[in-house]
Amino acid sequence: MTDNIMQTIAVIALGCPKNTVEAEYLLGIFQEKGFKISSNLDKADIVVIHTCSFIKAAKAESEKCIRTILDIKKKKSLRVYVSGCLPQLLKEKMSVLFPDIDGFAGTGTLQYLPDLVFGKNFGRFILPPGGLNDSNYRVLSSTIPSAYLKIAEGCGHVCSFCIIPALRGRYESRTMESLVDEVAALAESGIKELILIAQDTTGYGKDIYGAFVLDKLLVKLSKINGLKWIRLLYAYPSSITDGLIEVFKEHKKICSYMDIPIQHASKNVLSAMKRPLNTPGIIEKIKRKLPDIVLRTSIIAGFPGETKKDVNELINFLNRGYFQYAGVFEYSDLKEAVSSKLKRHVRAAAAKERKIMIENAQYNIFQAKIDKIKNNTIEFLVESCLKKGNVYSIKGRSSFQSPEIDGNIILENDKPLTVGGFCKAKVRSVDGYNIKVYI
């Protein structure tokens, strides 16, 4: 073994679950090359910072993290590499902003990062955008007993506020065979919940199979032994097919839950965003065919040209009660995005005020929905169990809650529960977006 192989590496993943999965693949690649893996920065000889730059806040977080690690580098022998969206966005500017970084890898070169660390290639390593695909070996992170499955890379849409196509390239689906093999390995390792992700999950397969075939993929995955739940995030409204809706009806392993980012409900704003104008109608159709499904969405407040009338139209649509959860974000103006050139930008203070209005409206809807199931029995996945005095404080999630964004199930119990197991309890009350239960 060379000195490089004996060294310890830590990978820091910033941003969304898609970056988490890529970091897991990176760790797998490094481990196969003989590196020791550690989450302890004090023990690391090499640190890889896997960055996000989708919005201003993500870009700022990435830059702050880089500076923090570079401060550590001043005090110890440490090599630092930056990968992902920030190098893809800034390219050669990275070496000017951060001259002490040892190397950079854009989104299309992640699989070659170990070569850069080994010194086979020196300096910047920026190539066309893309991402890791068809790789089965991962070092799973703290998401156990749940795991994300990235089914595609890139994006084929032209949303005016988004720079993902420039950062991630065109839409590329992974093959069904590679996904089935990976999920079988995940299930064998003890994973109970599988969460499908991509920039657009419902666009899956069109590029390689000639049609949207997410429904067929879900059927294959639902046959894998060991899995209890299969969850779908990042569904693009206009790609949701009748076949997909039927699969949700027929297969119990598929959670009756779907994340569909609509971004807005006003046609004026949707048009400026270059999003599907028939989005409200699509949501109505889904709820008509799947009345019990729990829907989550994402909304942008303060988009250029948005008026108070548009906001009222959005809130009126939300008040129909189609969504149980909504992530609301103030518009982030990136100079690289088409929307930055639009007229009538909304003042930051007004955007913040609108965000709060939308959040309050949605929370009232959430409370009303939970009130309707008080004292009903629900099943949840146990994620932690800590003893506090004579009581066990237990946290988990139901089939209608995604990790980190939809709150938790909270149970105080006199007996411990097994992490990774499932338990049934009755709904008592809400605390924020957490749901308190009792046995």
Curated annotation (Swiss-Prot):
EC number: 2.8.4.4
Key words, A-Z: 4Fe-4S, Cytoplasm, Iron, Iron-sulfur, Metal-binding, S-adenosyl-L-methionine, Transferase
InterPro entries per record: Elp3/MiaA/NifB-like_rSAM, Methylthiotransferase, Methylthiotransferase_CS, Methylthiotransferase_N, Methylthiotransferase_N_sf, NA-bd_OB-fold, Ribosomal_uS12_MeSTrfase_RimO, rSAM
Gene3D superfamilies given in the database record: Methylthiotransferase, N-terminal domain (3.40.50.12160), Nucleic acid-binding proteins (2.40.50.140), tm_1862 like domain (3.80.30.20)
Cellular location(s): Cytoplasm
PROSITE patterns associated with the record: MTTASE_N, MTTASE_RADICAL, RADICAL_SAM
Cofactors, names only: [4Fe-4S] cluster
Single GO cellular component term: cytosol
CDD domains to which the protein is assigned, alphabetical: Radical_SAM
Keyword set includes Iron-sulfur: yes
Any one of the GO BP annotations: tRNA modification
Domain MTTase N-terminal: 7-122
Domain Radical SAM core per the UniProt entry, residue ranges: 141-369
Name by which UniProt lists this protein: Ribosomal protein uS12 methylthiotransferase RimO
Source organism (scientific name): Endomicrobium trichonymphae
